[in-house]
Swiss-Prot record:
It comes from the Bacteria. It is found in: Cytoplasm. PROSITE patterns: HTH_DEOR_2. Induction: Significantly induced under copper-limiting conditions. GO terms for cellular component: cytoplasm. This is HTH-type transcriptional repressor CutR. Disruption phenotype: Cells lacking this gene show little or no difference in growth under copper deprivation, whereas possessing enhanced growth under copper excess conditions. Possesses a high intracellular content of copper. Residues 3-58 form the HTH deoR-type domain.
Length: 190
């Protein structure tokens, strides 16, 4: 079984049981505890689980965390925020499209919708149908490299003429963010 499949099973079990011991996970999968620790560490790094003494649990959501990015833990600025809606109808707030792309990549199978705001008009738009200007010279003072969403290709191209960058579809921007994740990502994600 691949690590991503084990991680999905771990998250499913956590939702059903609340907490799990590393030794129990190891026994269920028939793998070493070291293998489980590697899987769990990836979930901890993406803020999907919290380590406890000898085990793991799901993070507790508080009203304060609703105003913090679920990826990098920065405060969410409503003008640039993105909402990730899961198939279970859970809503995660993200500070910008950059973090939304990275969070989406971490949990693609669980995502139902990504909702963002058009940069110029501040209207709500599905990220899947939006156009993004990636690496524009205008600094939004959020995570880098930045991806700025637009509802129309025309607006994205006009913005690009003034501020540079590359106009991308959702899939192209996602690929760019994932390639730059290790090189230029400025997220303070722990």
């Amino acid at each position: 079984m691949l690590p991503i499949n084990r991680q999905q099973h771990i998250l499913k079990w956590l939702k059903e049981e609340g907490s799990l011991r590393i030794s129990d996970i190891s026994a269920r999968f028939g793998v070493s505890e070291m293998t489980v620790y590697r899987d769990v560490n990836q979930l901890v790094q993406s803020n999907q689980v919290i380590k406890t003494a000898g085990g793991i649990t799901l993070p507790v959501r508080t009203p304060q965390t609703d105003h913090m990015c679920s990826y990098c833990l920065k405060p969410v600025n409503q003008a640039h925020s993105v909402q990730l809606i899961t198939v279970n109808q859970d809503i995660e707030q993200l500070c910008c499209a950059h973090c939304a792309f990275l969070r989406y990549a971490d949990k693609t199978e669980e995502v139902s919708h990504l909702i963002c705001r058009d940069f110029l008009l501040q209207t709500t738009v599905s990220a899947g149908s939006a156009y993004f200007v990636v690496n524009a010279e205008l600094n939004l003072h959020c995570c880098q490299p930045q991806a700025i969403p637009f509802a129309t290709l025309d607006h994205a191209e006009r913005f690009q003429k003034g501020f540079g960058g590359a106009v991308c579809t959702f899939d192209q921007a996602l690929e760019d963010m994932l390639q730059d994740r290790k090189k230029r990502c400025t997220c303070t994600k722990k």
